[in-house]
Amino acid sequence: MNRMHIRWVSRGVIILLVIITCGMLLACGANKKEESKETSESFDMKAATNVTDTYMKYLTKEDIENSKKFYSKDLLKSTVSEKNNNLKIFGYNLTDTSEVGKSGVFKLKVARADITKPFASLDEYSIKIVKEESEYKISETNNTVQKEAFIQGNQIRLRNKNNVNTNLIIDIASMPNYAFSKDDKTNIGKIQVPKTKFSLINFSYGGENLAIATEDKDSYIAIVKIDESLAVQSDKGEDDKGGGGGSKENQGDKAKEKPIGKEITSVDLLKDSKVEFMTFSPEEKNLTVQYTKPGIGHCLRVYKLEGGDLISFKFEEKYPLDKVDITFSSYDKETLNFDVVPKKSGDKTITDITGKWQLSLKDFKAKKM
């Protein structure tokens, strides 16, 4: 009886162990299935960031059709095709990212400029990315104007957000009278700065710097550092003078308006050239200028913000400008993307250099993509 009892007990223990083991295996399988489901449904911020960057690159290139491919089904239904052909995006900088539930919100500073007149806008652009089935799509966009710079008479003025009042940045009379061309390596011959008119302007992403170009037959490029506290100091000074005063005094005060342009850095003077646009790098360490010149065509120059010096990479020396045009494409965080385009299609002598290139903004070395 004892042996029989022991056998039954042993069998019971074995059966119990088998049941427990099976239960554990089933539980592990369910957990793995649940983990797999959670992984497939989780939100990948890196993938969403890539969508945001690619979308902005398409907008910069004005490739509207490809940019629409990133819209969600609902957003695609509400798109409006109208656009300002003169006001273009020349750069953007991702300033903030946040994951909210199963979505990502990306905030960018976007620099826009008019290519036909001196007007620039610095906007905060917000993009919401959601996962639609297995793809990451843009479900919502918002744009808030941070700053505008524009021409009024011979002045460049600044408007903050929706303020009615504006502040003087600089007037054309305050521009330097003479400057050196970066082509003059001896720095001997100063050239008269063109003061016929302002041609183009553009903001840095922080809004503290404004790239300015003036032109007649030559083009002058400068960077003005903006200090908005000067406007507050100016207003306080006027308040301290007390009330009263007639219209002549008011006109005199207006004429003495203190500019918020704190200092100006001469960047370059391009002989017989026209500036097509200017754009700051995302890190705000460099300024890229695209210009055109008779007999040369389109070309780029990249300057350091600190001091306005040319970088060591000279596009004019690296490429045969009698055969190719050099045009700006886009920025990555520490690189400049540009295109080398043949002037004559089918020119087989330059196939090794035409195409897409990338310039490092750290060591200023270029490579073909």
Put a short name on every predicted segment.
Residues 24-27:
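C-terminal motif of bacterial Sec signal peptides marking the signal peptidase cleavage site
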Residues 29-32:
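Bacterial signal peptide processing site
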Residues 43-44, 50-53, 57-107, 295-296, ...:
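Short solvent-exposed beta->alpha transition segments
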Residues 121-191, 257-262, 357-369:
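Short beta-strand edge/turn micro-motifs at domain boundaries
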Residues 159-172, 211-217, 288-295, 337-344:
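Beta-strand C-termini and the immediately following turn/loop, strongest in propeller blades
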Residues 167-180, 217-233, 295-304, 344-363:
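Structural motif
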Residues 191-195, 266-273, 315-322:
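Surface loop/turn motifs at the tips and blade-to-blade linkers of beta-strand repeat domains
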Residues 199-210, 277-287, 326-337:
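Blade-terminus and WD-like Trp-Asp/Gly-His loop motifs, strongest in beta-propeller folds
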